[in-house]
């Protein structure tokens, strides 16, 4: 029996009328892409051929880059600029070992190099690259840029690049670095004031840093796509690096298109638009989201698992928020706890498709885990979805009772219902040998590093989505809790919560500094989820409302190749 063809919300809507049921529908707009990403066999063959054509050229260019890194090893400034270019251009994943060695060498020489060096650009770039890599370098190197009154000495307009690099560096600050807190604001104001007088490519860089995302908080693929044409405009650019960046970007795009086509075919089988029309039909946006978590070829299996599970989490979230009655949600939660196909007959018709699909996807995950020799991970994945659903139901109980919790009470539950603890667990499942059992237990214990990511993700989501959500029967957000508890205005509440987000980024930065309990590939999954939120939610909920800017981002990564000529 094909449940996707036989079960539909439409079938139950007539029953709702006769039973006088009112549902909290959100009226999400439909999928904006249609079947655009569904490739036929000839398209897939062509993508594979295009990727193979690039591989040989890429390998030759990679050897050349290794030589260049070796040649630059004794020249501090040349080496940090080369590492910076490689990272910004988006192909650093090919050179992780070489970059680790280079930055270890730079760290050993950093203090001596910066001690009497009054070049703001050089000091800032060195600080940022080392902090990004987890090195505990001191911000005291910037004391020499203060006047006798302790104020940051702003340079003349000829040194804008130095201030821009310093502004980027301040995004790596941690708690207690008051110097960087103050000068983060000052450097931003300075860049805003000089931007109208700048010309490209510097104007493009400054505008991007101010109005898009800092290097620390942006998505690697988008940042690379933006930086390539900027880098090319500088006379000092390295043609070797630029060509490798373009070829590698296009090769990855071909791989990602193949993956998205396969996932789109799976999603089409569920037929959300027909069978679950109350839910967000967002497989393309989900895939974009997961590219922000990991884009590298080695994580292809992990990526497919995470896209499928996150898509199902989205449907379950919408079922709890925008369709299910309290009684239906209770039955669904109990069925997930039992985790058995025998529960199918107890569920409302429209929920049967969701439940059956969850079990099928988890059967696939179990097969993959057995193949990888990591079958113990499946239990963590199952508990992740059970735990999330339990917390969704607790939220539904609050909504049913029209209960307004305190801000702290709300945050304790909201950090769980945002789903990111569960998603981080799922993101680890297919990552291979780098993940040990202890890593799952670490995430579940919600250490400060993980909690910081959850807090950022929850607050940013609440800030941009609270007004739309409160138009229907929806549980209160952080904004409403803060307004009621502090007896303040909505605007003041949003300002305060944004300040908390900025402060919590310091906790994330601190958690990345060495020594760390777990290897950086695991830490990056946690960090990258917050980066995605910064990109997709800071200006609005672009997952729910897929407007022109979000569509443009998707075109850049998944439709339009980079011009290599």
Curated annotation (Swiss-Prot):
Which superkingdom heads the taxonomic lineage of this protein's source? Answer: Eukaryota
Keyword terms = Lyase, Magnesium, Metal-binding
Does the keyword Cell cycle feature in the UniProt annotation? no
Q: Which positions bind Mg(2+) 1?
A: 317, 321
Positions with a binding annotation for Mg(2+) 2 = 317, 321
Q: Where is this motif: DDXXD motif?
A: 317-321
For molecular function, the Gene Ontology terms on record are:
magnesium ion binding; sesquiterpene synthase activity
What pathway does the annotation place this protein in?
A: Secondary metabolite biosynthesis; terpenoid biosynthesis
The reaction(s) catalysed by this protein are:
(2E,6E)-farnesyl diphosphate = bicyclogermacrene + diphosphate
Q: Does the keyword rRNA processing apply?
A: no
Q: Which residues bind Mg(2+) 3?
A: 461, 469
Which cofactors? Answer: Mg(2+)
The annotation note on the cofactor reads: Binds 3 Mg(2+) ions per subunit.
Biological process (GO) annotations held by this record are: bicyclogermacrene biosynthetic process; diterpenoid biosynthetic process; farnesyl diphosphate catabolic process
SUPFAM superfamilies from the entry? Terpenoid cyclases/Protein prenyltransferases, Terpenoid synthases
Gene3D superfamilies attached here?
A: Farnesyl Diphosphate Synthase, Terpene synthase, N-terminal domain
Under Enzyme Commission nomenclature, its number is: 4.2.3.100
Q: Which principal EC class is assigned to this enzyme?
A: lyase
The record's note on its domains: The Asp-Asp-Xaa-Xaa-Asp/Glu (DDXXD/E) motif is important for the catalytic activity, presumably through binding to Mg(2+).
Q: What does this protein do?
A: Sesquiterpene synthase converting farnesyl diphosphate to bicyclogermacrene as the major product.
Family stated for the protein in its record: Belongs to the terpene synthase family.
What's the name of the protein? Bicyclogermacrene synthase
Organism of origin is Phyla dulcis (Aztec sweet herb)
